[in-house]
Swiss-Prot record:
Keywords: Cytoplasm, Necrosis, Phosphoprotein, Plant defense, Repressor, Translation regulation
Expression (tissue specificity): Expressed in all tissues, mostly in flowers, leaves and stems, and, to a lower extent, in roots (at protein level).
Species whose genome carries this gene: Arabidopsis thaliana
Repressor in keyword set: yes
Sequence ranges assigned to domain GYF in this UniProt record: 546-597
Protein name, entry field: Protein ESSENTIAL FOR POTEXVIRUS ACCUMULATION 1
Subunit structure: Associates with eIF4E initiation factors and the ribosome complex, thus likely contributing to the proper translation of target proteins. Interacts directly with RPL18B and eIF4E1. Binds to SMG7.
Gene name of the encoded protein: EXA1
Alphabetical list of InterPro entries matching this protein: GYF, GYF-like_dom_sf
Pfam families attached to this UniProt entry: GYF (PF02213)
Gene Ontology CC, one term: plastid
């Protein structure tokens, strides 16, 4: 029966697959009498059978299955029903599988054509049914829901790998009473729709042949859950089911039946999803499939019947050749999910699946992304994340390679995935399962970054890597896997360390790994790797298609021989992955099986993970396949973190693991990696160890060797760097060897030096770089390396650092990842960027200490505390010594390097010399391409790995380094000219590298040497400002400056350099992307001040360091702006050479613009960096003094883009500090009140600010730039302005480019509205100052936006205004603008375009200038403005209306005066700025009394117009009201500007602001004020109702006004809660309800009918107004209802009728209204 079924099915379906084992398996699976019909073991046997059944014995399966089913008591449902079910079920399953497969096909183009066709042909039809079946298990929606989950698994599986894994495991288990999975998952799934599903399975007899044939493969990967089982191709797919406990039984059979794809892992994973289909279902499908051998697929019903009818104990016997894998199998049969109540986790998952929250197993499925599976990024990113868990990451790399095949992953996933997927499903995995789950959980911990599925996968991946490589190769591998599971139980812990420490725990990892490696499977794996490698070599024929291969299915059964073309076809069809264990038919029987990817490396590029799994990226495959492998070739540059690099390396290593392992072992033998063995264990597991790990196949032995060697060496080498070396050496050696024999050696040499230095094995690593490095003394190299490593470490965030500490090895691994680029530090650069702000030195020490401790604790637990202490002490001593030696030697050597590099840099600068970033980028790209050359050269020239790495550094690293150096030079050198345009072009990255090296070393070892170097170097740079380019000249002169530092030490200057260094670190990455020169220019401009203010600089440095940390988030945005503007400012700064600076400004603008044109992204990055630097510079400058501020006053054509959105506000402390500094700096130059000139500009800015922060910033920056450039403004003014508003300038700078154009337009508008703008700005400024404080209050978001607007305007105004108050304001502006921008970014989107309660509140606040506005609700200290205060305010407003000009005269008068005079605005600004609080209090009291009420509910003009103009213009028509001039109106204008910012352009705001002022003049009586408030409130309610309910019917709101707050809140939540999930509107409304006087509320809705009747459908409104006048409720409810023409009766209910009220309260009003 098995044979016949196998014959027919295999012939029909698995044309190339011999499914004899499947026959056997099918036999087991055929009947419930089989020992393990539903158990995972049964499923596992079933895979072989499924192969038979699916491939050959599908009809037999059905026949057998029918028999079995009949035997189980499904006689009626036996073959016929099964066929029906199977036909239907297979269709569903096939469809689902097909969908997964289809994803897989999509993932794999080759598969997609076949599978998609198949799926389209039969899978579609049956797929839905199939899904129904599956869903039957889950819910009444049998077909769709079930399928939906699969689809989700398939579709979303990629998104949610972990959920899908869980889900798949559940599906798999639910398909059969897997011992583990079936318990709950299966019961869970089966129970809900087991009957329906069975019926579906039986009933829908969709032509399974169609679906089955094309689905089978797809299911193995795409279906991932029972689908694969159902696909006839599924046998292969189901082969994957073996690995998963989920669909184990069915998929397993299919797997064994499945084609070679059933190779360990890939097909297993694939089958795991497939397994989700009940084996019977698969049989049914196969049976139903015409011409298809009845697969041993039971419909769920039949499976359940089998389960019910058969004694599960009889199935406890495992099929012959069945390998018990704890993670995949349970000692005892598990109840089908249909029979078992799902666990709470399962229930949650099921619910989530039904709700669509979980659309996939959560496994990183790449099925959607193409044959390879996902975007390489998709999978690599989880992997990328994985670097944390070196094992898993490494294994994950291997795993990914396997994932490429999909089956490898699937299989290990089956083992681990169940764990992972079952992590939440403990019941799924009983017994052994738990350890793996635990393992995976640690793995997940380590790889928390990775998708949840990815983490478990990682853990399983480690296992899988081993197992996939070998265990998966053999049935014995499974046994090993079992033992491996035990081992992995250890690894579990180790993985916890691995994942948790992210390769920092070489010991825990290493021990676990070593345990694992000690574990037979692990031990076996290394040899397997070698054997496989050898075998692969043996196996590889001239033409893969010509090969005759046996493959080992997950059952461990040898299938075949099959032609290579068949194997390839199956592989492409997704039946198995590159991890399929194959052996040449001609190979001896005892010859080891090799991975298909090894035998057919070209398939690696094609291999894709199962649909539910993120497959290794094609890059990985390429890397794996082309073990040449620059895993980071594209990926490192693609911005992968070192983690990604690690993953790439791991990937690569896994692929190239055999070769790399050999090399690694050789290196270990050579001792080069001896310490790296620790790295191998700790990080190496991910890095070099990871190389071994991914290569865990041979890595276990390597790790053992490395571990022993490393431990011995590390023990022998107390220096903490021995640990570093271990890690880095591991990284370097394995990475270098793995990644590139070619490019990696040069990369390696610096890395080796680094590693050796870190390891204390300088000689060891230096030999790699022996040729070029000899120039450098080992100690120096060591120091450089140490510093470089530190830099990398410090650059690396600590969170990342743990991952990276191993990944610090990533610098090495980066080398590995970047060997292509020979950019050992290339990967680090991102980290460097990340940690740039951190004190490199401290970070380095901390990292070294932490890493060393971790390494010692983890990898070298044997090390005694003394050793650890010694290591730490030695590390510190070494660090100190290295600092000193490095300082000295690096100074000398760097001088040499600088001389050498300078020539190189000149050449390279000539290469890069083009100021344009595009060229620079090209040059950088060239550097990346040239790194091997340059790297070798640099390595030769500069042993300091930093140099090498920097040269080889990725663009990111190179740029950051270059920026750092350039910035350092720039900071030290005033010539911002050179830096701006020449930073990239002129400064050779290599030159920069030496500088950066100096900086880095200085940073790392903040010895006086660094300080001296920094100070003296800076001084020399200053003296050398004429240098063509800071980089060039600096580098050129660096030799001298370096010697200077050696001889000289100006602590103060040094402090500035340190600050600069920290900045540079930040800027390095930042400038790296943006015009490096700009930031450098900024710094260079600052340098004199730095020297001048050494103490300040020290403070500033500290502050900068703090900020750098704090600002990192906002540095990106701020520095982006700062970079744009700071360079401009520097250019503008006439410090050392104002002419040059101005030239630079032009150049910078060009350069910045060019950079923008060339690489906006880089510009953004550099801008962000520059912003940070600029902020830091501003701080430093403020600290340093006026000169600094002047220098900082650089108007750089900021980047066109707006970094503001990403801009992160500084902490209040930072802001306060900045304000203080700015205040000081501005106080130094309060003289510049002439900045009023820019106030005119600023006025528009106020309007623009309301428009958008970026606009404000842009325009403000443009304004400041314009003011500086075009407006009559002393440079001291720009300086002060820049200093004051440096932060906002930073924000505005990048905007400047855009803003300059916009600004010109705006300036024209401003010129027209200068006075008003100034007034508005003044109000905004005053308001903003308070807003800055009060903006965070209850109306925080609104105030944020308003504040952002006003603050933007204020900033714009402040930029021009140089008053101390303005300066402080500008500081606050900068801060508040940043905050406001952030807040506004947060808030503005939420701000309704029309008048909103927030707008009213904001207007109030703005009009009042934050303190009063805060009172609007309870948000501010000004809460006094509550109903009573509103009334008072109304009265005051009336008074103010009558005498509105005088009361607000302080601000408004100025404003009035200002409108005519943009420059006089300075006075008003001075006035408001000098006493913003006074102006605020005045205008706030005045405009609050009047404007607040008006503004609270809307612009005062609105009320006025409503009363006077009758046509109450909306906010968008504020220009109408804008004609009114009243301080209150000005405030209103400000608020209006805010609203306009939401809805109107800056021009409109600008125009409307004066108009608003006029509107204020129209004066309003208290009634008018109340009416205005009422109208504003009503309009706001309408707008909100329209927004939330889609209609202006405010009946609910009116009714709520009649209710108590709690009742109203309840009602509103009932009615609007779904539409206002955040309850923002509800809260606002309730606040208004509480704050508004009852009369205002009455007026609001009466006026709706009457007062605003004309506006609000007067007829109805009046009609209801009469009613409203007579009856409040009638008025309230009836009016609005009447307006709608709906709910008139409802309005009656609104009037208070309980029935309707209850309905309303029930939220039915909305329904009724709708």
């Amino acid at each position: 029966m098995a044979n016949s079924s196998a014959g027919s099915a295999a012939d029909h379906r698995n044309k190339h697959l011999s499914v004899n084992p499947p026959h056997q398996i099918f036999k087991d699976i055929q009947g419930s009498d089989n020992a393990i019909p539903l158990s995972p073991q049964w499923l596992l046997s079933k895979p072989g059978e499924n192969k038979t059944g699916m491939g050959t014995g599908d009809p037999n399966q059905y026949g057998n299955h029918s028999d079995v089913v009949r035997t189980t008591g499904n006689g009626e449902e036996t073959l016929d029903n099964l066929k029906k079910k199977d036909v239907f079920r297979p269709s569903l399953l096939d469809a689902e599988s097909g969908r997964r497969d289809r994803w897989r096909d999509e993932e794999r183009d080759t598969l997609s054509s076949v599978r998609n066709d198949r799926w389209r042909n039969g899978d579609k039809d049956s797929g839905d049914n199939k899904k129904v079946d599956r869903w039957d298990n889950v819910a009444p929606k049998f077909g769709e829901q079930r399928r939906g989950p699969n689809d989700r698994w398939t579709d979303s599986g990629n998104k949610d790998a972990a959920p899908e894994q869980r889900r798949e495991s559940k599906w798999n288990s639910r398909w059969g009473p897997d011992d583990k999975e079936a318990e709950i998952p299966r019961n869970k799934w089966d129970e809900p729709g087991k009957d329906g599903e069975i019926i579906r399975e039986k009933g829908p007899s969709l032509p399974t042949s169609d679906g089955d044939h094309y689905r089978p493969w797809r299911p193995s990967q795409g279906r991932g859950r029972g689908e694969a089982l159902h696909n006839q191709s599924t046998p292969n797919k189901q082969v994957t089911s073996f690995s998963h406990s989920r669909g184990r039984g069915e998929n397993t059979a299919i797997f064994s039946a499945g084609r070679g794809r059933m190779s360990p892992g890939g097909s297993i994973f694939t089958s795991a999803p497939n397994q989700s289909h009940p084996p019977g279902s698969a049989s049914d499908k196969g049976e139903s499939g015409p011409g298809e051998p009845p697969h041993l697929r039971y419909s769920r019903m039949k499976l359940l019947d089998v389960y019910r009818m058969a004694d599960t104990e009889c199935y406890e016997k495992f099929p012959d050749g069945f390998i018990e894998v704890p993670s995949l199998t349970s000692e005892e049969p598990t109840d089908p999910l249909a029979l078992c109540a799902p666990s709470s986790d399962e229930v949650n998952v099921l619910d989530a699946i039904e709700k669509g929250k979980i659309v996939s197993s959560g496994a990183p499925q790449t099925s959607k992304d193409g044959p390879t599976g996902r975007n390489p990024v998709e999978f690599s990113q989880p992997r990328r994340i994985r670097p944390a868990g070196s094992r898993e990451d490494m294994t994950f790399g291997a795993e990914e390679s396997k994932d490429e095949s999909g089956e490898t992953r699937n299989y290990p996933d089956d083992k681990f995935r169940p764990e992972a997927s079952h992590e939440g499903y403990a019941p799924f995995r009983r017994g052994n399962e738990a350890p793996v789950r635990e393992l995976k959980e640690p793995s997940m911990q380590g790889n928390a970054h990775v998708q949840s599925a990815s983490p478990w996968r990682q853990s399983s991946g480690g296992e899988r890597s081993n197992r996939n490589s070998h265990d998966w190769n053999d049935p014995s591998a499974d046994s090993r896997l079992k033992s491996s599971d035990s081992v992995w139980s250890h690894p579990k812990d180790s993985i916890n360390h691995l994942g948790g420490n992210n390769m920092m725990l070489p010991q825990s990892k290493g021990e676990s790994r070593w345990q694992i490696s000690e574990d037979p499977s692990l031990r076996r794996q290394p040899s397997l790797v070698f054997d496989r490698e050898q075998e692969v070599r043996k196996l590889l024929p001239s033409s893969p298609e010509e090969l005759s291969l046996y493959y080992k299915d997950p059952q461990g059964l040898i299938q075949g021989p099959f032609s290579g073309s068949d194997i390839i076809g199956w592989f492409e069809a997704g039946y198995f992955g590159i991890d399929l264990l194959v052996r040449l038919a001609s190979a001896p029987n005892d010859s080891p099986f090799s991975l298909l990817g090894d035998v057919m490396p070209h398939l690696r590029a094609k291999s894709g993970p199962p649909p539910g799994f993120t497959g290794a990226k094609q890059n990985e495959f390429v890397d794996a396949a082309g073990t040449s492998a620059f895993p980071g070739v594209g990926k490192v540059h693609s911005g992968m973190g070192e983690t990604d690099m690690l993953q790439n390396d791991m990937r690569y290593k896994h692929v190239a693991g055999t070769v790399a392992e050999n090399r690694f072992i050789e290196s270990l033998m050579s001792g080069g990696l001896t310490n790296s063995a620790q790295g191998v264990q700790g990080y190496g597991v991910n890095s070099s160890g990871g190389l071994s790990l991914p290569v865990t196949d041979g890595g276990a032995d390597m790790y053992l060797l490395a571990k022993k060697l490393e431990l011995e060496r590390q023990r022998s080498i107390p220096s903490p760097y021995s640990y570093w070396p271990g890690r880095e050496s591991a990284n370097l050696m394995p990475g270098s060897e793995n990644v590139s024999e070619n490019a990696q050696q040069p990369t390696r040499s610096p890395s080796s030096d680094l590693l050796s230095i870190l390891q204390g094995v300088t000689d060891r690593s230096s030999p790699a770089v022996s040729g070029p490095l000899p120039a450098w003394s080992q100690p120096i190299q060591k120091e450089s390396d140490l510093h470089h490593a530190k830099t990398f470490q410090t650059q690396i965030p600590f969170g990342v650092q743990q991952q990276r500490l191993p990944e610090q090895n990533l610098p090495l691994s980066g080398l590995l990842g970047q060997p292509m680029e020979n950019n050992p530090g290339g990967m680090l650069s991102p980290d460097m960027m990340l940690a740039a702000g951190l004190s490199q030195e401290h970070q380095s020490l901390n990292l070294l200490q932490q890493q060393q401790l971790l390494l010692q604790l983890n990898a070298q637990t044997p090390l005694s505390a003394q050793h650890q202490r010694l290591l730490v002490e030695k590390m510190l001593l070494l660090k100190h010594q290295h600092k000193q030696e490095e300082q000295q030697q690096l100074l000398r050597q760097q001088q040499q390097l600088y001389s050498q590099v300078f020539a190189d840099q000149q050449r390279s600068q000539q290469r890069f010399g083009d100021p344009s970033y595009g060229q620079l980028q090209a040059s950088l790209d060239a550097l990346r391409l040239q790194p091997s050359k340059d790297m070798s050269q640099v390595n030769q020239q500069v042993q300091v790995p930093v140099s090498h790495e920097e040269r080889g550094i990725n663009l990111a690293d190179l740029l950051p380094v270059t920026h750092a150096t350039n910035q350092t030079v720039a900071s030290f050198e005033t010539p911002s000219l050179h830096l701006q345009n020449q930073l990239f072009g002129n400064v050779d990255p290599r030159m920069v590298l030496p500088d950066q090296i100096d900086d880095t070393h200085k940073k790392e070892s903040k010895s006086e040497y660094e300080r001296t170097v920094s100070a003296d170097y800076v001084n020399s740079l200053y003296s050398e400002k004429p240098v063509l380019s800071p980089g060039y000249h600096a580098t050129h002169n660096v030799e001298e400056p370096v010697s200077y530092p050696n001889n000289e030490s100006s602590t103060a200057t040094m402090t500035a350099p340190e600050i600069v260094e920290s900045k540079l670190l930040e800027e390095q990455s930042k400038d790296m992307y943006a015009g490096k020169g700009e930031v450098s220019i900024e710094l260079s401009g600052e340098t004199p001040a730095t020297e001048v203010k050494n103490n300040d600089v020290s403070v500033a440095r500290k502050t900068s360091e703090k900020k750098s940390r704090k600002q990192r988030a906002k540095q990106a945005a701020d520095l982006a702006k700062s970079t744009s503007r700071a360079p401009l400012q520097e250019t503008k700064k006439p410090q050392p050479g104002s002419a040059d600076d101005s030239e630079i400004k032009g150049k910078t603008k060009k350069s910045a613009d060019t950079l923008i044109d060339n690489d906006t992204h880089l510009i953004k990055s550099s801008t962000a960096t520059a912003s940070n630097t600029s902020q830091m510079s501003s701080e430093v400058d403020s600290v340093r003094g006026e000169e600094s501020s002047l220098q900082n006053t650089r108007t750089q054509p900021g980047r066109a883009w707006k970094p503001a959105p990403g801009f992160k506000p500084k902490s209040l402390l930072e802001i306060q500090m900045e304000e203080q500094r700015v205040a000081q700096a501005e106080a130094l130059a309060p003289k510049i009140s002439s900045t009023v000139n820019s106030v005119g500009s600023a006025a528009p800015w106020a309007g623009i600010v309301t428009n958008s922060d970026s606009n404000i910033l842009r325009e403000t920056h443009g304004e400041s730039a314009i003011t500086q450039t075009g407006v009559v403004k002393p440079e001291s003014v720009p300086t002060l302005k820049a200093k004051k508003s440096h932060l906002h300038d930073l924000l505005a700078d990048d905007v400047f480019a855009k803003s300059s154009d916009k600004e010109r337009e705006v300036m024209e508008i401003i010129s027209n509205n200068d006075a008003f703008m100034q007034v508005t700005t003044t109000n905004a400024e005053s308001f903003d100052d308070d807003n800055f404080i009060d903006a965070r209050e209850t109306k925080k978001s609104r105030k944020k936006s308003a504040r952002a607007k006003t603050s933007g305007a204020k900033i714009a105004a402040h930029v021009p205004a140089v008053d101390t108050s303005l300066q402080t304001n500008s500081v606050e502006k900068g801060k508040s603008s940043r905050i406001l921008q952030q807040q506004e970014k947060e808030v503005l989107p939420a701000i309704p375009s029309g008048p909103s309660l927030g707008d009213f509140v904001l207007w109030k606040g703005e009009s009042v200038n934050n303190p009063p506005p805060a009172a609007a609700w309870s948000s501010g200290p000004k809460k006094s403005t509550k109903p009573s205060s509103l009334r008072d305010i109304v009265k005051e407003q009336e008074k103010m209306t009558t005498s509105s000009h005088p009361p607000p005269s302080p601000v408004p008068t100025t404003q009035k005066a200002i409108p005519p005079q943009a420059h006089q605005g300075g006075a008003s600004w001075s006035r408001s700025a000098s006493s913003p609080s006074q102006a605020v209090s005045q205008s706030s009291s005045q405009s609050k009394s009047k404007g607040d009420d008006d503004l609270f509910w809307g612009p005062v003009e609105q009320s006025t117009q409503d009363t006077k103009q009758g046509d109450f213009p909306h906010l968008t028509s504020q220009n109408s009201w804008g004609t009114k001039n009243t301080p209150g109106k000005v405030n209103a204008g400000t608020s209006l500007n805010r609203q306009k910012s939401v809805s109107m352009g800056s021009a409109d705001r600008v125009l409307s602001s004066p108009v608003v002022t006029q509107a204020s003049h129209k004066g309003k009586k208290e009634a008018v004020t109340k009416l205005t408030e009422a109208n504003g409130f009503r309009d706001w309610c309408k707008s909100e109702c329209l927004r939330l309910l889609g209609s202006e019917d405010t009946s609910v709101l009116e009714f709520c006004l009649k209710l108590s707050r709690s009742e109203a809140e309840t009602l509103l939540i009932e009615n609007l809660g779904s539409r206002d999930p955040d309850h923002k509107f509800i809260d606002k409304f309730l606040n208004y309800k509480d704050l508004l006087p009852s009369e205002v509320v009455e007026i609001a809705f009466q006026s709706k009918g009457s007062g605003v009747g004309t506006r609000n459908n007067t007829g109805e409104d009046y009609y209801y107004n009469t009613t409203a006048a007579n009856d409040g409720f009638s008025k309230v409810g009836g009016k609005k209802k009447a307006k709608k023409g709906k709910k008139v009766s409802l309005s009656a209910s609104v009037l208070g009728f309980n029935v309707v009220s209850n309905r309303i309260m029930m939220g039915e009003i909305q329904t009724i209204e709708d």
